Amino acid sequence: MSETRSVSMPAADAPTVDAPWPVSVLSGKIKGWIDRLGTAWVEGEITQWGGSGGNVYGKLKDLDVDATISFTVWSSVRAKIPADLGQGARVVALVKPNYWVKGGTLTMQVLEMRHVGLGDLLERLERLRQTLRAEGLFDADRKRRLPFLPGCIGLITGKDSDAEKDVLRNAQLRWPSVRFRVVHTAVQGDRAAGEVTRAIGVLDEDPEVDVIVIARGGGDFQNLLVFSDEKLVRTAAACRTPLVSAIGHEADRPLLDDVADLRASTPTDAAKRVVPDVSEELSRVQQARARIGMRLTSQVRGEIDRIEQLRSRPVLSSTAWIVDSRAEELGRYIARSAELAGRVVERGMQQTSELSRQLRTLSPQHVLDRGYAIVQTADGSALRAPADAPDGTGLALRLAAGALGATSTGPTDDIPSSAARLPSSPAPDARPASGAES
């Protein structure tokens, strides 16, 4: 049976190793594909914003993952969008992909751009809040107590910021010997969430850091959104070191406040809550010493009074009666002890005599004394049957007072009449020699 195969031939314009496309052809086809994509609404954060000749060139970053696109706002569109747009703004934009054939670059042409509505941000934030709450990250039983006196405090804050100065100054005023490990990060903008997240990990791995403080001197809602970043919040929740959030914003508190072990209203408040006040602690020590001194003095005085009362009792004025009253009782105990000891000794002697008698009865020598003999072969084993000593076998006879050598004449049924007068139940190993001659 024959089989027909269908072989697809490459299209006439398909590139091959022998007939490759020119770069311009490939670029033209890419542009054609991209032009067919049409327009799309996208949401993100502006991370770069710069103008030239009335046009704006920038970059738009995804709010959740590490993804960025370049965009262009022509001057005609720039005049129609909000004037306060710029780096750090969260926006929604209508874009059309545009591929530049000459340079081989892809950019998004912005047709419209506007701020993300506050309602949209709050709704997204609330959804994340509910998710984290359902996972138990806000539960009170997850909160850890701060150490009473941390040896080293990890501080995450902006470089040379007021928050940094407030924390350091107030903590050192309260406890001058406190140590800090400060990690400077961005506290707003597109780099802030990643830098703060990494800083938490670095300080959490440091065995000397006993507590971590994240401090920022307040700010508007947009600037504080970085502290509601999901990855940052989850990293803070998983932190093994007690963590304090000191963002300094009472309203619209970021999610970091909810997962932190302690929320401080301001950086100054954080400094006051992570270290004790040395003057207050010294005062407590002085008060405790005073209370202990008063208690000890009172207790000693009470014991002295009790001793004086005991000394004044008539029974202690003459102590001889204590000995006299116990002398007769002691005599009775001594007599009874002597009597009991005598009984024990007598009983022991009786038991010893009985055991001695039993030992003598069981002794092999006792059996020999009764006229029996132990017959042994040349190898020293006891002879138990006549068959074990055939004619001519050398034997040794152990008697009560010595030993004899003998030679077996073989088994015999002739037993001397005197053997009948021997005891009827000799020891198993002490049978009279049979058929042996000495």
UniProtKB/Swiss-Prot annotation:
GO terms for molecular function: exodeoxyribonuclease VII activity; nucleic acid binding. It comes from Clavibacter michiganensis subsp. michiganensis (strain NCPPB 382). Its EC number is 3.1.11.6. HAMAP family: Exonuc_7_L. Disulfide bonds: none annotated. This is Exodeoxyribonuclease 7 large subunit. One of its GO terms (cellular component) is cytoplasm. Keywords: Cytoplasm, Exonuclease, Hydrolase, Nuclease. InterPro entries: Exonuc_VII_L, Exonuc_VII_lsu_C, OB-fold_nuc-bd_dom. Heterooligomer composed of large and small subunits. Its main location: cytoplasm. Bidirectionally degrades single-stranded DNA into large acid-insoluble oligonucleotides, which are then degraded further into small acid-soluble oligonucleotides. It catalyses: Exonucleolytic cleavage in either 5'- to 3'- or 3'- to 5'-direction to yield nucleoside 5'-phosphates. Residues 405-438 are annotated as: Disordered.
